[in-house]
Amino acid sequence: MKMGTRRAHRQARTVWAAGTVTALCAVALSGCGATAHSARPSASHASASLDAPSQLDPPRPAPDISLTNSLGQRATHSRYRGKAVLLTFIYDHCPDVCPLIVANLHNALSMLGARAREVQIVAVSVDPKGDTPATVKAFLAAREMTGRMQYLIGSLRELAPVWRAWGVAVQATPDRREVGHSAFVYGINASGNVTALYPANLKPAWIAHDAPLLAAE
């Protein structure tokens, strides 16, 4: 597949061991205003570019996710086979990086027009206590993403295995007002394989270009 991400330097790599994603580049933590480190970091770490997408070669199967959304409905990643899936990890009271990611994804959907129906955006919470059905609903409504993004929440016991499976580092500040976390967007093709990794400051045009290609695979 010749995607827009091939034009970027491959400044990040992902290793996959025993069915678990360990993102070498996903250890750069976005504290949403804070600097944090994971208490239990991934086995291998490397610095990552925050201004260019990366192609994952070869693609690898995406670890499945089974969590509930803000409506209490169970959602799994495998449910979206046949679509391009853009997966990210955020929290709804983040002051900067998370809203930026969602705004860029919203703009990408607008650029896609009718083809946006081929894309499913999924967000997984990194704040089990702060992200509630009510706050998530308000977050989605404020950003015109109601019905356009599945925002999955749960308890720490439910979310922590998902973070580990995706190599996402999470650490709340002592006052729990902010959460340091890996801030990337994973591009998953229609066959359920992760093929690309986008930085938090992704350009909507990258997604508008790549999403139809992901949906066709």
State where each predicted segment sits.
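Short, internal strand/loop/helix patches
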Residues: 137-182
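Thiol-based oxidoreductase modules, predominantly thioredoxin-like and allied folds used
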Residues: 117-131, 148-157
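N-terminal targeting signals for export/organelle localization
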Residues: 1-64, 68, 217
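Conserved helix-turn-beta segment immediately C-terminal to the redox Cys motif
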Residues: 83-84, 101-123, 141-142
